[in-house]
From Swiss-Prot:
Pro residues biased stretches: 774-789, 914-926, 1048-1062
Protein name, per record: Ataxin-2 homolog
Protein keywords: Cytoplasm, Developmental protein, Phosphoprotein
A Gene Ontology biological process term: compound eye development
The encoding gene: Atx2
Length: 1121
């Protein structure tokens, strides 16, 4: 057997036999006896590790892998230190402490005792260790094994302690507040047996035992510098200074916090015990709190909406609602979707409205009409009873609210009819009459022919034409209503002292009727839209009861004139002057077939029809009507303007602010401004629907009708747009080129507007041109309602009075007109043209702007309140301002920076597209730019073709379904809002042309191509109009091209407004007009309904066309901007 020296010292090694006296013994398997281990050193044995020992002469099998068997190792190791019984092959059983085992599993027991043995060894000799070779061991048994023994009694961490009852103990003791005892003198010593010593005892012992007396003074006097407190003046000053300094330090919030922390109740902050509340009680409280918060939030939202109701709407959808102006408060809110045609009962000049209210008639109805016309889609009837008007008469406001038709769908809104003077006033608003803006003219038939001043409630329920763009105009409209024009007028219609006459009377509530004829017509943007656009008659001839074919007469006093208005619109071409005369009484009243909120299908259908009907210049039918209407309106406006000029000017300024608003807003703003400004003026000319009775009445209040008997309230919004278009258009139409291009129109309008508004009649009713109030006939402005979806042209037909080619002339003439507008009372020949804007859209907004400006006379900006409209409005406003003064042009504000956001008078009527430049805008030399001055800058040479491309939404998906989407209509429906409106707004606000207002849709430049309608798949209205300008002039905006995508925040310095003539002065001369190249004016109208993709095919190269043909790209700013 091998003996290892190691085994002597390492029992675990297998060990050598131990002597009888002890030590390490090795069990001999052969004779079952223990042999003492041999202490002499021998060959190193492997017993400690994996070595194999031999028992006797036999070679023991090696237990391999003992250490490799983790489970075995774990079990065996766990037994180390435990008492085990080892059963041997011989039958002997040993019991001892399991000490260790080797790699071959030789087992070492400590203090073994043989429990059972065949051959009993000497019992007196117990070895200290015995090593049992693996081959002799049968089994090992551990008895009474405690697996936790090794760790039992060890210190437990706090975590281990807390695990037992952490939050799980239910039998907690009831907590009781601590009571200090009766005297509060209880012993609060923590440990009475503290192993410490008392300092006083120390001092005593030192003194008594050691004779050492301590000098310690517990007063700490020796540790601080004693103060020499004296009565000297120096001490007092030093003390006061110290106290002041101390007070500053102590009053420091940080110092206070620290002191509170140090001196505060630490227990309450850090150690107090707080029982968790019952779960259900806690949940109930939380639920209540949540409900309270929700309720508060709803109330805040409601209040905010109510407050906003007085402000111009912010978004196309919302702005309509908001545009409801203060009507939010008084009138049901509109839904976000396309709003029903704006019945817009809003007392149009608040003053007028108030006055009518006294009469029990609401002139206000007209007020919104025009603006609504533009914004029609969005602003639902949002009966824009101006707050003033509404406030004045509860019933009226409720009627308006009803008219609003919360659904905002295109549907006729029925208003309660309020009998005025015993007559039922129905705001018949022809549904969707694109030109229907005139619908307003239901005149309260107080027996008052005009119904303006008297009870003739000319509820011009102007169902706003609903254009995709209309939303803006509506907003604008709402704004133009300006909360209550009466506010503007400083009272219900303080403007005309008489306005108050009706103040006390409730506004008659009207039902808005949709006229079937008008409904579909409203979208006819082509020449056919007469009934709607062209037709929104200003029932100029009282005697033409039949005229009102499109919309049932809103006869309130049986004023056929209202009925006639539509027909008369048609006739108005023939008898614009008649309208002027008649306008006084019936004109405003003729309800125009107004566009009511219509379904997408209707809109699409109208758009398609418009696309088909759209002609560059061919359609003259509606413009004439509008022209005549406008002349009347213009006359009225002029009259009103003359009277209200001062007020108008003020409002024009407001309008300027508003002008930044998107086209619809512009229209609305224009309208509002017109209403506001016109309010004094009576909105006669400017608020298309407003011109209601405004002709004669220079009401400051939007309800021009009330001021002057205006049976025909301005046709409602559609008309408003048309009217606006007419006004500006007519103003432009003087130039007769409105068809040319919206931009040009807008410019022209702006340019003309100031003058034309001065002499809006000049164009429209050239006879009326003189702003004499005497020409009472309010020409209803029937701006052809811009196509709902197709921004390009509703006025295409409108274009027409002047041959569409006149569009070219419109641009130049706009300048001329602008220059000459004031002088020319006889622009009426152009009225037809006027009716139509080249793009119709622009023209509409422009017209609206013009009308508003005209009404406002001093609100060029107001005119620009819509983006496009704004510019036109600005021009118009300038003109209007001028008109207001009579022939005197009003100085127009203009801002130099077209790109600047600030012209985002978004506050304006919920401008869906503030005219602020869109980031993608690509400045391009713009041939025709509308300058803030309102004068027309010959942006594109007259020969320049204008490309009217409907602008896609900013970032619209390739297939922009918006054309068909009514909901988008609210914002997208800004036909007018297209580039021109944006342009106009920018121009108006900044005084400098806006190069590219929004993301540019792919522009296809079709040089020299005659007007082309590009209908994006379903979006017929999306015509691209190529307006060849007669003159090749190019207006180069310096370097505009360099800033391709100016950010709205960064003005394009490159573009500086081309020379801007003052509204009074002639139109601006083109900054640069190289006759060599033909310029193409590319107008990107923002047509929400039109799919931008169709334009995608052509390359957008026109943006920067450095090549010969310069393309003027007016990018409409995205409405979202």
């Amino acid at each position: 057997m091998n003996n290892n020296s190691k085994r002597k010292t390492r029992p675990s090694g297998g060990g050598g036999g131990g002597g009888a006296s002890g030590g390490i013994s090795r069990y001999n398997a052969n004779d079952n006896s223990l042999r003492p281990a041999n202490n002499k050193s021998g060959a190193a044995g492997n017993s400690a590790g994996a070595g194999a020992g031999t028992g006797g002469t036999a070679i023991r099998p090696v237990a391999q892998g003992v250490y490799n068997n983790t489970f075995f190792m774990h079990s065996a190791t766990a037994l180390v230190g435990s008492v085990v019984e080892v059963v041997l092959r011989s039958g002997n059983i040993y019991e001892g402490v399991f000490r260790t085992f080797s790699g071959n599993f030789d087992i070492a027991l400590e203090l073994p005792a043989c429990i059972k043995s065949k051959n009993l060894p000497e019992e007196g000799k117990v070895p200290k260790h015995i090593i049992f070779p693996a081959d002799t061991v049968v089994k090992i048994v551990a008895k009474d094994f405690d697996s936790q023994y090794a760790t039992a009694g060890a210190f437990k961490t706090d975590e281990a302690i807390s695990d037992k009852c952490n939050g799980a103990r239910l039998d907690e003791k009831e907590l009781e507040p601590w009571d200090s005892g009766a005297n509060g003198d209880i012993d609060i010593e923590l440990d009475g047996a503290a192993n410490g010593w008392d300092a006083n005892e120390m001092f005593r012992k030192n003194e008594n035992t050691f004779g050492v007396t301590s000098t310690f003074d517990d007063s700490l006097a020796t540790y601080t510098i004693p103060l020499d407190k004296g009565d000297s003046l120096e001490f007092k000053e030093a003390e006061a200074k110290a106290e002041k300094l101390a007070a500053e330090i102590e009053n420091n919030p940080t110092c206070r916090d620290r002191l509170d922390l140090e001196n505060g109740d630490e227990e309450a902050l850090f150690a107090a015990v707080e029982r968790p509340e019952q779960d259900h009680r806690r949940d109930g409280d939380r639920e209540r709190e949540r409900n309270d918060r929700d309720r508060e939030r709803e109330e805040r939202d409601r209040d905010r909406d109510r407050d906003r109701g007085n402000k111009p709407p912010r978004g196309a959808g919302d702005f309509q609602l908001r545009e409801t102006m203060s009507s939010d408060r008084y009138i049901t809110k509109q839904t976000r979707g396309p709003q029903m045609s704006h019945v817009s009962m809003s007392s149009q000049g608040g003053g007028g409205g108030g006055r009518d209210r006294d009469n029990g008639l609401m002139m206000p109805g007209v007020i919104s009409g025009g603006g609504a016309g533009q914004g029609g889609a969005t602003q639902s009837a949002a009966v824009l009873l101006l707050a003033g008007g509404l406030k004045a008469s509860g019933p009226a406001s409720s009627a308006n609210a009803a008219g609003m038709d919360a659904s905002g769908k295109y549907s006729m809104v029925k208003r309660k009819t309020v009998t005025q003077g015993g007559k039922v006033m129905r705001g018949n608003v022809p549904p969707n009459s694109s030109g229907g803006g005139n619908i307003s003219a239901v005149q309260g038939g107080n027996g008052n022919p005009v119904g303006q001043s008297k009870g003739g409630y000319q509820p011009t329920m102007v169902m706003q034409n609903q254009y995709a763009y209309q939303g803006n105009s509506q907003i604008m409209h709402g704004s133009s209503q300006y909360r209550n024009p009466s506010h503007m007028s400083g009272g219900p219609s303080k403007l005309n002292g008489d306005a108050n006459a009706n103040t006390n009377k409730p506004l008659p509530q009207r039902q808005i009727r949709q006229y079937q004829g008008s409904q579909s017509n409203s979208l006819n943007y082509g020449g056919e839209p007469q009934p709607q656009m062209g037709k929104p008659m200003h029932s100029s001839h009282g005697g033409h009861p039949g005229q009102n074919s499109n919309s049932p007469p809103l006869q309130t006093g049986g004023q056929p004139q209202q009925q006639q208005q539509q027909q008369q619109q048609q006739q108005q071409q023939q008898a614009p002057q008649q309208q002027q005369h008649q306008n006084m009484a019936p004109q405003g009243q003729q309800p125009q077939p107004q566009r009511q909120m219509r379904s997408r299908d209707n809109q699409l259908q109208d758009l398609r029809q418009f696309g088909q009907d759209f002609q560059l210049a061919p359609t003259n039918n509606s413009p004439p009507q509008q022209q005549p209407q406008q002349p009347q309106q213009q006359q009225q406006q002029q009259q009103v303007q003359v009277q209200v000029q001062a007020q108008v000017q003020q409002q024009q300024q407001r309008a300027l602010l508003q002008s930044a608003s998107p086209p619809q807003q512009q229209s609305q703003q224009q309208q509002q401004q017109q209403q506001q400004q016109h309010v004094p003026m009576q909105h006669q000319g400017p608020p298309p629907h407003l011109h209601q009775a405004a002709l004669s009445q220079p009401h400051y209040v939007p309800q021009p009708q009330q001021q002057q008997p205006q049976p025909q309230q301005q046709p409602p919004p559609p008309q408003q747009q048309q009217q606006q278009q007419h006004v500006p258009l007519h103003l432009q139409q003087k130039a007769q080129q409105p068809p040319q291009q919206q931009q040009q129109l807008v410019e022209t309008q702006h340019q003309l507007v100031p003058k034309q508004h001065q002499q809006p009649p000049a164009q429209q009713q050239q006879p009326q041109l003189a702003p004499e109030p005497s020409q009472q006939p309010l020409p209803l402005y029937h701006p052809m309602p811009p196509p709902q979806t197709s921004p390009v042209v509703i006025t295409s037909p409108v274009l027409l009075e002047a041959p569409p080619p006149q569009i070219l002339t419109a641009q130049q003439p706009p300048q001329q007109q602008q220059l000459a507008a004031t002088p020319k009372p006889d622009a009426s020949p152009a009225p037809g043209s006027n009716t139509t804007t080249p793009t119709g859209i622009v023209s509409t907004p422009t017209t609206a702007a013009a009308s508003s400006a005209g009404s406002e006379k001093s609100t060029p900006a107001a005119a620009s309140s819509g983006a496009t409209s704004g510019t036109a409005a600005a021009a118009v406003g300038a003109t209007g301002a001028t008109g207001s003064t009579g022939s005197t042009p009003v100085v127009k504000k203009h801002v130099l920076n077209p790109s600047a956001k600030p012209f985002t008078p978004r506050a304006g009527a919920g401008t869906p597209n503030p005219s602020r430049p869109h980031t993608p805008q690509t400045p391009v030399p713009m041939p025709g730019i509308y300058t803030t001055t309102g004068t027309h800058v010959p942006a594109a040479a007259t020969n320049q073709p204008i490309y009217v491309v409907q602008q896609q939404h900013p970032f619209p998906p390739p297939t922009h379904p918006q054309a068909g989407q009514p909901p988008r209509l609210r914002r997208n429906n800004y036909a007018p809002m297209g580039a021109s409106q944006m342009h106009v707004s920018a121009t108006t606000a900044t005084g400098q042309p806006l190069m590219a207002a929004g993301p540019m849709t792919q522009f296809i430049q079709y040089p020299h191509a005659p007007q082309q309608h590009f209908q994006s798949q379903g979006y017929a209205p999306m015509p691209m109009r190529l307006y060849p300008d007669q003159q090749p002039q190019l207006q180069f905006l310096t370097q505009t091209p360099q800033s391709t995508t100016p950010s709205p925040g960064q003005p394009h310095q490159p573009f500086h407004p081309p020379p801007q003539p003052s509204p009074a002065g002639g139109g601006p001369q083109p900054a640069y007009t190289p006759p060599t190249q033909q310029t193409y004016q590319l107008m990107c109208l923002h047509s929400q309904h039109v799919l931008p993709n169709p334009y995608f095919q052509p390359q957008p190269t026109p943006h920067h066309a450095p090549q010969n043909p310069q393309y003027q790209i007016v990018m409409q700013q995205h409405h979202a901007q």
